[in-house]
Amino acid sequence: MLSLLDSVSLPYLILSACLSVILLRRFLAHDKGGSKSIAQGCLPEPRLRQWDPIFGFGIVISQARALRGHRYLEWLRDLHASMPHTKTFSANYGGYRWIFSIEPEILKAVYATNFQNFGVEPIRQHPPGFQPFAHKGVSTSDGDDWSFSRTLIKPFFERSVYVSTDRIKPFADKFMTLLPDDGETFDIQPLLQRWFLDITSEFIFGRSQDSMTHADRAEVTWAMADVLRGGRQRAQTHRILWAFNWDWWFEAVEKVHGFLNPYIRSTLKELEERQQRIKDGLPVDEERTDLLWSMATMLPDEEELRSQVCLIFVPNNDTTSMFIGHCLYFLARHSNAWKRLRDEVDAVGDAPITFEMLRNMKYLNGILNESMKPKPLSSKLTLALTTLCTPAHRLIPNNVTQVRAALSDVVLPLGGGPNGKAPLDVRKGDIVSVTKTVMYRDPDQWGPDANEYRPERWDGMRGGWHFLPYGGGPRRCPAQMMVQNESAYMLFRLAQKYSTIVARDPEPFRARMRIGPSSMHGVKIAFYK
């Protein structure tokens, strides 16, 4: 026996062992369904044809190349287009069974009906993809850890906070002073990012970064963008991290931590000193009201607090500014839509801009829901397609896919059988990924004009599981109304000031994936009063 082993090379033994483990796991997984799934009418789902059906590394590598080549949207569209006779199918993804779907009922099951059966820890926390950037937080945890993270932030997203337009006004006023003269071409995306960095830093840390006055203070924004871009790539290629050079990502993480650490350390020190003064019976100043202070009172550990703050501040610093940029990108290419928005704004007159007013403006909210659409998609372009708390709207949602891991065996209402209409047996460890942008362009849900930008389609339309901009069920984004209020306010102010918006970018839309898709070429426009 020993002589036989001596004649076999070590790499061959390792390869054979890996192959045996994967085959055994796949056999055991397919053997677990048993009589229970049969009794519920479950049928096998259609499976993607793969050149590497055993290890499933082919699809992992092709996705990694798409992300690095800024073709992720195209990759997702082509993936679903390759299975035209079903809305749900599976693939072997690095040895795991991934179930891809555009069925609203499956999204409903994952979000709400079977919420307890699905989680995010196996895909966002247990693999090393996000570390050392962050570990536990509202978007990476399940169970009690998730409930605690939600408790940390929930008070700051109550109605009394998100309805305020007074909080937005001074930052919008400053933003308006930075816009160039009539007819001058400029990229509005960096200005939007500086605006949102300032308003967010005041909300979270109690003092604004003031990057609209001091542009150099916005450098951390670019580091955060790299963290998000790399985080997505690492999360989706965590089984082959060794195949890539991640030095650039670790440098970005170090810059972001270097930005946050002084805020966190000074807050913890101030909190400790305040508590000591209270204990000694000494007078104290009025207590701070920012989010970081509130979180520190419940979580006074520096490393754990930083993880929680990272997963709130960094992803959400990118989303609202990117979302508004998407809306303007499209409005600059559709003059009639801008005119209709102007007419709605003019009809309000000089009335104060309030949350209730913005919520009742039908066309403005139609623009927010419909979001942005680039040039018409060719046969090779994706229907477009991330996950933390992000504004995900119809044509190019920031939340591109909704991915969950099965924490226990469960039966989904659809997905089985050759056309995906029978119940589907999902086993513990399987991954369910709902591709929102393909679902948001599905003619069966939206009609023959599903690929067209029509804000008016939302007039009288009721919501449903086929369109969930901010998620649903217990994990619904707590910042939904705040994002809507901030975005609506900024579009209102711009339409109030400028009669015309013109596109000045000859490049077709190409998405760079961060927390969601952003235009590689920015949003180059010109305004006219």
Swiss-Prot record:
Induction comment from the UniProt entry of this chain: Expression is positively regulated by the cluster-specific transcription factor tenR and is induced during cocultures with the natural competitor fungus Metarhizium robertsii.
Gene Ontology cellular-component annotations: membrane
Chief place where the protein resides: membrane
Pathway: Secondary metabolite biosynthesis
Membrane topology: Single-pass membrane protein
MF-aspect GO terms: heme binding; iron ion binding; monooxygenase activity; oxidoreductase activity, acting on paired donors, with incorporation or reduction of molecular oxygen
Compartment(s) where it occurs, according to its Swiss-Prot or TrEMBL record: Membrane
Record has Transmembrane as a keyword: yes
Cofactors (names): heme
InterPro entries in the cross-refs: Cyt_P450, Cyt_P450_E_CYP52_fungi, Cyt_P450_E_grp-I, Cyt_P450_sf
Enzyme class: oxidoreductase
Keyword Secreted part of the UniProt annotation: no
Cited Pfam families: p450 (PF00067)
Function of the molecule: Cytochrome P450 monooxygenase; part of the gene cluster that mediates the biosynthesis of tenellin-type 2-pyridones, iron-chelating compounds involved in iron stress tolerance, competition with the natural competitor fungus Metarhizium robertsii and insect hosts infection. TenA catalyzes an oxidative ring expansion of pretenellin A and 14-hydropretellenin A to form the 2-pyridone core, leading to the production of pretenellin B and pyridovericin, respectively.
Membership in a protein family: Belongs to the cytochrome P450 family.
Protein name (database record): Cytochrome P450 monooxygenase tenA
Species this protein is from: Beauveria bassiana (strain ARSEF 2860) (White muscardine disease fungus)
Gene name, Swiss-Prot/TrEMBL: tenA
